[in-house]
A protein has these predicted regions:
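Hydrophobic beta-strand-centered segment that forms part of the acyl-chain substrate-binding groove
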Residues: 63, 69-109
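Catalytic strand-loop segment that frames the active site of acyl-thioester-processing enzymes
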Residues: 2-68
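Homeobox/homeodomain signature
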Residues: 20-22, 30, 57, 82-86, ...
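Detector for methionine-enriched segments
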Residues: 36, 77, 129-131
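A residue-level detector for conformationally permissive "hinge/kink" positions
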Residues: 54, 62, 90, 95, ...
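Residue-level marker of positions within ordered structural domains that often coincide
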Residues: 45, 82, 115
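HotDog/MaoC-like acyl-thioester-processing domains
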Residues: 1-32, 100, 107-137
Length: 137
């Protein structure tokens, strides 16, 4: 969870993060559909309205759209890493660096690293890198 100061603003500034590597060994594209966010909120008992209540998310919290779940983003990244490696990871770490919003394309990028494990990151066109991680096999 990320707690922010209460502020009502229409001036959403997007800071574009640099991507950690130019070309991925593997990439998936996921559309961040609002229904996916609602369902994930339901199955994880997450009642935070920024994930499913558009007027609340945009008018009260000042986001540009519904906010995509960080844990869902991490789960999708781990799933893509295991699919690419065709094995189950014994360790996975991740860190969110920028928000992802509904109604956008989320790119999941996987790259082999020198230790035989995988570097992972997610990105959007507007924000650049949104989450980074490593899967160990």
């Amino acid at each position: 969870l990320v707690y922010r100061d209460i502020q009502k603003t229409k001036n959403n500034v997007i800071i574009k993060n640099d991507l950690p590597f130019e070309k991925s060994d593997y990439e998936e594209k996921i559309f961040t559909h609002p229904t996916m966010l609602f369902r994930y909120s339901a199955i994880t008992f997450n009642g935070h309205r920024i994930h499913y209540d558009y007027p609340y998310s945009t008018e009260e919290e000042g986001y540009k759209d519904l906010v995509f779940h960080g844990p869902l983003q991490a789960t999708l990244m781990l799933r893509a890493a295991e699919k690419y490696k065709k094995a189950k990871a014994y360790f996975f770490s991740h860190r969110g660096v920028a928000p992802v919003y509904a109604n956008d394309n989320l790119f999941i990028n996987i790259e082999n690293n020198e230790n035989g494990n995988l570097n992972c990151f997610t990105s959007t066109k507007d924000a650049g890198m949104t989450m980074k991680g490593e899967a160990k096999f």
